[in-house]
Amino acid sequence: MKHLPAQDEQVFSAIQDERKRQQSKIELIASENFVSEAVMEAQGSVLTNKYAEGYPGKRYYGGCEHVDVAEDIARDRAKQIFGAEHVNVQPHSGAQANMAVYFTILEHGDTVLGMNLAHGGHLTHGSPVNFSGVQYNFVEYGVDKETQYIDYEDVREKALKHKPKLIVAGASAYPRTIDFKKFREIADEVGAYVMVDMAHIAGLVAAGLHPNPVPYADFVTTTTHKTLRGPRGGMILCREEFAKQIDKSIFPGIQGGPLMHVIAAKAVSFGEALKDEFKTYAQNVINNAKRLAETLKKEGIELVSGGTDNHLVLVDLRSLGITGKVAENVLDEVGITVNKNAIPYDPEKPFVTSGIRVGTAAVTSRGFDLEAIEEVGAIIALALKNHEDEAKLEEAKQRVEALTNRFPLYTGLDY
């Protein structure tokens, strides 16, 4: 960085500190990843200066001919990756992508079927503290109490009983493969639309390692970060018949000017996702998650549903006698970043929880292999089982430092 250190020392210092944190800690938050330096360069470009309300070729401002190119590239690449008929890359976030779909097909008070937040759903899938739960009549489905897999019969029974206008599939903390075909079949029985929120698994879908929801859903929403490894933002994929309505719901419906520098960064990351190297990366993400799950189970730690099919593992801490809040703090102390997370049928409050969610997208981007991820699992077990033993926690800290030194991050940056 050439100008920021001299112009604004306080902000530069915060950026430096965050850079050091990312280097010195092991990032296991399942919704985070490390983008390429090319993505960061696009996002930090002169495109940040350009207002571009509207869509390519139909803008409300002049001088958009070059940002139009960037947006067209992003849309075309996303179509190619996922086989979608129409793509909107303007949503600022996954939540706004979901909002746009709701505003497109729902009226206030309409019935929607969505996954219970504590069972792995998302705030925007009907939580009473979110606009979705306030605006619409959400009926919740969840996972089977024994298997902790989605109970598709429960989904069907509730659909038949409540006749929802929309069924939402997808999750923020569900470690198993979702059967989108089954959701489509249930929706067809009751004449409902299907929206799939694939925010967490989009990168795995892009690599052909998770079933693609596009053939089964009327609408697919996603973030562009997480496993897709792009900038923070959202995206909507839909059938051509809904294209104009979706575009109107985004602009002028719920957003004004799109963030053209972010859209350019999305385009760069989509280009990366089309390469063979990305498929290898995504396979390694899954391999690492499975190995992490196996390691934790060998250490006697319980996992929701017994394991994982994707990039994340949901840990049930009750047998260890600690809460998710305590575990998050203990692991942060030794240099491992996770988030506390509710587990199905959780007796604890949402800010306390009985679980933690861990994911392998970021550490895999950093280069962690199976041997390294086994060591991560062993360190987690050591810290959680000995969370009040300062000597053991110091040992865990040193082992984390050895790993982070072995896998440096962003060596080309000058700050």
Swiss-Prot record:
Where does the record place a coiled coil? Answer: none
Q: Which UniProt keywords apply?
A: Amino-acid biosynthesis, Cytoplasm, One-carbon metabolism, Pyridoxal phosphate, Transferase
Pinpoint the site Plays an important role in substrate specificity. 225
The keyword Amino-acid biosynthesis is assigned to this record = yes
Instruction: Output the GO biological process annotations, alphabetical, semicolon-separated.
Output: glycine biosynthetic process from serine; tetrahydrofolate interconversion
| Pathway, per record | One-carbon metabolism; tetrahydrofolate interconversion; Amino-acid biosynthesis; glycine biosynthesis; glycine from L-serine: step 1/1
Chief location of this protein? cytoplasm
- Mind telling me which InterPro entries this protein's record contains? PyrdxlP-dep_Trfase, PyrdxlP-dep_Trfase_major, PyrdxlP-dep_Trfase_small, Ser_HO-MeTrfase, Ser_HO-MeTrfase-like, Ser_HO-MeTrfase_PLP_BS, SHMT-like_dom
Question: What is the top-level taxon of the source organism?
Answer: Bacteria
Q: Which reaction does it catalyse?
A: (6R)-5,10-methylene-5,6,7,8-tetrahydrofolate + glycine + H2O = (6S)-5,6,7,8-tetrahydrofolate + L-serine
Annotated binding of (6S)-5,6,7,8-tetrahydrofolate, by residue: 117, 121-123, 241
Which Pfam families does this one have? SHMT (PF00464)
A single GO molecular-function term is: pyridoxal phosphate binding
Give the cofactors, semicolon-separated: pyridoxal 5'-phosphate
KW rRNA-binding (keyword) present: no
Q: Which GO terms describe its cellular component?
A: cytosol
Instruction: Name the enzyme's class.
Output: transferase
Enzyme Commission number(s): 2.1.2.1
- The chain residues annotated with the modification N6-(pyridoxal phosphate)lysine are 226
Subcellular location(s): the record lists: Cytoplasm
PANTHER family named in the record:
SERINE HYDROXYMETHYLTRANSFERASE, SERINE HYDROXYMETHYLTRANSFERASE 1
Please give the subunit comment from the record. Answer: Homodimer.
What does the UniProt function comment say about this protein?
Answer: Catalyzes the reversible interconversion of serine and glycine with tetrahydrofolate (THF) serving as the one-carbon carrier. This reaction serves as the major source of one-carbon groups required for the biosynthesis of purines, thymidylate, methionine, and other important biomolecules. Also exhibits THF-independent aldolase activity toward beta-hydroxyamino acids, producing glycine and aldehydes, via a retro-aldol mechanism.
In which family does this protein belong, per the annotation? Belongs to the SHMT family.
Name this polypeptide is given = Serine hydroxymethyltransferase
Q: Which organism is it from?
A: Bacillus licheniformis (strain ATCC 14580 / DSM 13 / JCM 2505 / CCUG 7422 / NBRC 12200 / NCIMB 9375 / NCTC 10341 / NRRL NRS-1264 / Gibson 46)
